């Protein structure tokens, strides 16, 4: 207000009078100053008003100073807050960086875990595959070992089977031969042939066969000696048997011939032995042999061996012939045996066939030597010529099945000659009879073969020719027409 009054005074205006007086001139218009109180005159108390104004100014200044102080304090606090905020921001950045690093490490760890899991799964799969392969290999190796063992067993059995079968067949045939030889009457008597002729014949043969043939002929000669002359020669027989066995071990052919000669030797020793040895015969003709043995015992005391040989009847001679023919059949059956072997062993089969052929030739040569040695001493000159002709014919046909029958027939003839040396007429008749029988057997054996050949040729004939038929059409015949009955 004081300022307004001072401004009005400076302006030189007239302060209008209020209600107490009218300070304006007449005739002038009304102005704004006339409305306000600035135009009033200063009262007497204006000094006090100035003092109040000064006080008020001081207060205002004091308030301004306080305001300035507050502003400065707020500025300082703001700066502090800004600094704290910057520190917090830095810390936050650090925490964010640490967090990002932690997350990156976690992600890397997860990736590594995944890779390790994948590797572990792959290794497990590989180990499983290797284990399965090892199991398969072990199974296959076990199967191969089992198959190899089975094949070895089969090969061993297949190798042993033919030998066992051959041994069984040979053993059965030997037993059959022994039984047949035991069925022959035991009162044979023969004279010892001169050793010069046998030795000359042996020297004409090969060196490899000479030793075996001489041993076999010597055994046959010792077996054919009459046992009336010596009874207590048991000590002399043992070394002879051992020598014969030693030579027979090296030669399979001479072994069987030696066995046959041993059986003949035992049969020849029966008349001088007691009657307890006679019932050992196991053939169906054993009863007849027992009866004949009783007759021969009664005649032994009265007659010599040559007279006893004449008492033998024709049926007994027939039995001897049948026994010899059965021996021939057994031997022929023995040499015709062929073991069933697989086709892979053709070389072994050929070797066995060669061995059998050599064995047959050795047996034939041994029997021929025995027959010649016996017949030279007992039979006459024309009989010797006939036998020489037969032997020459046999040598040319040793590989045929016929010579076995011929040799066995001659063996029967020799036995009959040894049985009855004092009756040459009966022996000649028997020789002629056996010749006729052998010729008939040969003719019968050859005829069916010719008939079989003719039948085969007729059965394998050429089909009858037909004229060329006219072809109606080259189309295929329908099924219903094909299925029709003719």
Curated annotation (Swiss-Prot):
Gene Ontology process terms (BP): cell division; maintenance of meiotic sister chromatid cohesion; meiotic sister chromatid segregation
GO cellular component: chromosome, centromeric region; nucleolus
Tissue expr: Highly expressed in roots. Expressed in panicles. Expressed at low levels in leaves.
A Pfam family matched in the record: Shugoshin_C
UniProt feature coiled coil, ranges: 71-154
InterPro entries in the cross-refs: SGO_plant (IPR044693), Shugoshin_C (IPR011515)
Keyword terms of this UniProt record: Cell cycle, Cell division, Centromere, Chromosome, Chromosome partition, Coiled coil, Meiosis, Nucleus
Region (Disordered): 137-163, 187-209, 222-251, 323-346, 382-403, 418-467
Biased composition (Basic residues): 387-396
Disrupted-gene phenotype: Complete sterility, due to shrunken and inviable pollen grains. Premature separation of sister chromatids before metaphase II causes defective meiosis of the male meiocyte.
Subcellular location(s) per record: Nucleus, Nucleolus; Chromosome, Centromere
Biased composition (Polar residues): 423-433
Basic and acidic residues: bias regions: 331-346
Top-level taxonomic group: Eukaryota
UniProt keyword rRNA-binding, yes or no: no
Family from the record: Belongs to the shugoshin family.
Record function comment: Plays a central role in chromosome cohesion during meiosis I by preventing premature dissociation of cohesin complex from centromeres after prophase, when most of cohesin complex dissociates from chromosomes arms. Required for the timely assembly and maintenance of synaptonemal complex (SC) during early prophase I. Required for maintenance of centromeric cohesion before prophase II and correct segregation of chromatids during meiosis II. Has apparently no function in mitosis.
Protein name from the UniProt record: Shugoshin-1
Upper classification of the organism: Eukaryota, Viridiplantae, Streptophyta, Embryophyta, Tracheophyta
Gene that this polypeptide is encoded by: SGO1
């Amino acid at each position: 207000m004081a300022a307004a009054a001072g401004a009005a005074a400076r302006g030189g205006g007239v302060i209008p009078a209020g209600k107490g007086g009218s300070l304006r001139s007449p005739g002038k218009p009304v102005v704004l100053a006339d409305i306000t109180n600035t135009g009033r005159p200063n009262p007497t108390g204006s000094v006090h008003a100035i003092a109040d104004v000064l006080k008020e100014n001081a207060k205002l200044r004091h308030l301004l100073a306080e305001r300035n102080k507050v502003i400065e304090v707020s500025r300082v606090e703001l700066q502090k807050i800004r600094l704290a905020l910057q520190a917090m921001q830095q810390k936050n950045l650090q925490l964010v960086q640490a967090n990002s690093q932690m997350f990156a490490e976690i992600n890397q760890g997860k990736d590594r875990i995944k890779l390790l899991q994948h590797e572990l799964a792959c290794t497990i799969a590989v180990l499983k595959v290797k284990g399965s392969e090892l199991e398969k290999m072990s199974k296959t190796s076990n199967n191969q070992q089992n198959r190899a063992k089975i094949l070895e067993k089969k090969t061993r059995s297949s190798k042993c089977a033919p030998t066992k079968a051959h041994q069984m067949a040979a053993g059965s045939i030997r037993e059959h031969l022994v039984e047949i030889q035991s069925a022959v009457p035991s009162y044979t008597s023969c004279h010892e042939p001169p050793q010069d002729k046998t030795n000359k014949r042996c020297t004409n043969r090969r060196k490899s066969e000479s030793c075996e043939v001489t041993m076999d002929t010597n055994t046959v000669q010792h077996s054919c000696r009459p046992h009336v002359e010596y009874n207590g020669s048991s000590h002399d027989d043992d070394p002879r048997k051992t020598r014969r066995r030693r030579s027979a071990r090296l030669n399979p052919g001479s072994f069987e011939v030696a066995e046959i000669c041993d059986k003949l030797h035992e049969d020849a020793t029966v008349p001088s032995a007691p009657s307890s040895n006679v019932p050992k015969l196991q053939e169906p003709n054993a009863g007849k042999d027992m009866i004949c043995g009783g007759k021969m015992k009664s005649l032994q005391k009265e007659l010599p061996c040559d007279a006893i040989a004449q008492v033998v009847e024709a049926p007994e001679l027939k039995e001897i012939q049948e026994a010899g023919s059965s021996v021939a059949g057994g031997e022929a059956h023995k040499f015709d045996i062929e073991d069933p072997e697989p086709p892979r062993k053709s070389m072994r089969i050929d070797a066995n066939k060669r061995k059998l052929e050599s064995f047959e030739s050795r047996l034939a040569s041994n029997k021929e030597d025995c027959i010649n040695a016996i017949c030279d001493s007992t039979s006459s000159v024309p009989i010797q010529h006939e036998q020489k002709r037969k032997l020459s014919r046999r040598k040319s046909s040793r590989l045929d099945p016929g010579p076995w029958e011929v040799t066995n027939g001659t063996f029967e003839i020799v036995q009959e000659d040894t049985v009855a040396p004092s009756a040459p007429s009966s022996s000649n008749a028997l020789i002629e009879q056996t010749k006729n029988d052998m010729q008939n057997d040969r003719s019968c054996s050859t005829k069916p073969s010719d008939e079989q050949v003719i039948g085969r040729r007729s059965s394998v004939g050429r089909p009858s020719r037909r004229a060329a038929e006219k072809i109606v059409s080259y189309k295929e015949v329908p099924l219903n027409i094909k299925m029709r009955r003719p």
